[in-house]
Design a protein with these regions (language model features):
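FAD-dinucleotide binding site
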Residues: 2-491
Length: 491
């Protein structure tokens, strides 16, 4: 089996880039995952100027997200996604990327699930029935569009003050580019989704997310070759041969491959460091989970499907990735003429063979013939929405099994570039630090694509969790320090 870097980099725009909807939930409970707060370097005179503006995401602590994407930890299988996608008594239906076993963790997966759920509802609903949809992300929006067009009475409730969920577009004062702190690029999208993006008037620009500029802590450019891909392939093959599923971290150790657990922060280039950088720019951004959490069998696809890994790699090399000028209009266009209630936090859903009801945190409730639930897996795992009666065992098992990963972005705008702006130097929009102790090691340079001096820092899994508790000033110090190896030294 061959796992190429490009396999994961089509998802590097997806780990946070191709996220899905946010739903409705009361205040966030204490998270079960904890990671030590990232160290903040001592500020020093640096060739990297202070950004003139920044926008940071906080999906891991967002009360209506509780994570960025779903993943399969040890013991979970794609069948758990299929189980969660099943309806209950033809009254309660589920959608969202976590329910899509073909394209989980992506906009396409969210789209697929919304289309599927709308079709399932239409197959059993009578003419003009009232359908309640919980969550105004992409899955909820496309389902609402399909059901309204089919003549159903659709009411969509969303906890936020806006639609879109983890499609979150803003354009703050002073920014000439749209800032998507959630889904920021489109990769691997099917024809229907791409057509809807264009129909919504969303501008797109091709962006090559496969080419990477790998740099050592001293600023020297590295040729990392296939070290990371080869080690991951070896680990997955070893894991697939075991009698039971083991964490990906254990598969690295057991296979004899270069082990990212042996990487030493700040040590510079080395095989373990190359593998760690490969995972930081790939698996961590597509799953939001660390090797110690990911299933070696299913965490990165089906490890037993030795003939499909190269096919995945080839598919990811298609020049289909595009940077958009903001994805929010996509959701807005889908919800045109749909009845949407914002700031409506759902606290309970009741159902029986006769119908369903939706209870809001305000104490109000309303009835519907059927309910479509599109909240993220992180929200479902909190039991914040109480189902009465409780969901069937298969659904509860699936919710417990599927993980909620964390991926964050940090958008930085500079008055001028401090990096080498020569054509050869900026040909790769992806930057990766190898063997660095920096808190943010993966970056996207938008200057070659947009002409604007904007960088996006990407962090996933434990790296993302370690930055959550930092203040804005602390995070900026971490970011500026991390970017020093990319700065041009005067003279």
């Amino acid at each position: 089996m061959t796992i190429g870097r490009r396999t994961f980099l089509s998802g590097a725009a997806t780990g946070v880039g191709l996220l899905v909807l946010a739903g409705c939930t009361p205040p966030r409970p204490t998270p079960t995952r904890s990671v030590t707060k990232a160290p903040v370097p001592t500020p020093s005179t640096t060739a990297v100027p202070t950004p003139s503006a920044f926008v940071r995401s906080a999906w891991g602590t967002d009360p209506f997200a509780l994570g960025s994407t779903s993943y399969l930890p040890v013991g979970a299988t794609p069948e758990h996604r299929d189980d969660l996608a099943q309806n209950v008594l033809d009254r309660v239906f589920f959608a969202g990327e976590a329910t899509d076993s073909s394209e989980p963790g992506t906009l396409q997966g969210a789209w697929n699930s919304g289309v599927r759920a709308a079709g399932e509802i239409a197959a059993v609903a009578g003419d003009g029935e009232r359908i309640a949809i919980v969550g105004a992300g992409l899955a909820g929006a496309i389902a609402a569009r399909r059901l309204v067009d089919a003549g159903y009475d659709v009411t969509l409730v969303e906890a936020r003050e806006r639609t879109g969920g983890r499609i979150a577009t803003t354009q703050p004062d002073g920014w000439t580019v749209a800032v998507d702190s959630g889904a920021w690029a489109l990769a691997g999208a099917g024809p229907a989704l791409r057509e809807s993006v264009l129909d919504a008037g969303v501008g797109t620009t091709p962006i090559d997310l496969a080419a990477i500029r790998s740099v050592a802590p001293d600023g020297s450019v590295l040729d990392v070759g296939t070290t990371g891909a080869d080690a991951l392939t070896r680990a997955l093959e070893w894991g697939a041969e075991q009698s039971e599923d083991v964490p990906l971290a254990e598969a690295f150790a057991g296979s004899g491959a270069a082990d990212p657990a042996e990487a030493e922060a700040g040590s510079g280039d080395g095989e373990p460091e190359r593998v760690a950088a490969f995972l930081a720019g790939g698996a961590a951004l597509t799953t939001g989970a660390a090797p110690a959490e990911l299933s070696s069998w299913y965490g990165l696809g089906d490890a037993s499907a030795a003939t499909t890994a190269q096919e995945l790699d080839d598919d990811s090399e298609r020049a289909d990735a595009v940077l958009t000028d903001g994805l929010a209009p996509l959701v807005a266009s889908l919800l045109e003429d749909v009845e949407v209630s914002l700031r409506a936090v759902v606290s309970g859903i009741g159902y029986d063979e006769e119908g369903a009801s939706v209870r809001l945190a305000t104490g109000e409730s309303f009835s519907a013939d059927r309910v479509l639930v599109t909240v993220p897996i992180g929200v479902l795992k909190t039991d914040a929405i109480v189902f009465d009666p409780p969901l069937p065992f298969a659904h509860r098992t699936a919710i417990a099994a599927i993980g909620s990963g964390v991926v964050e972005t940090l958008w930085l705008r500079f008055d001028e570039s401090f990096w080498d702006a020569d054509a050869d130097a900026v040909s790769a929009v992806r930057w990766s630090l190898v063997g660095s102790e920096a808190g943010i090691t993966e970056w996207v340079n938008l200057q070659p694509v947009t002409g604007e001096t904007v960088l996006i820092g990407l962090v996933g899994a434990d790296q993302a969790l370690s930055l959550q508790a930092l203040s804005d000033d602390e995070l900026l110090t971490v970011a500026v320090t991390a970017l020093e190896p990319f700065a041009v030294v005067p003279g």
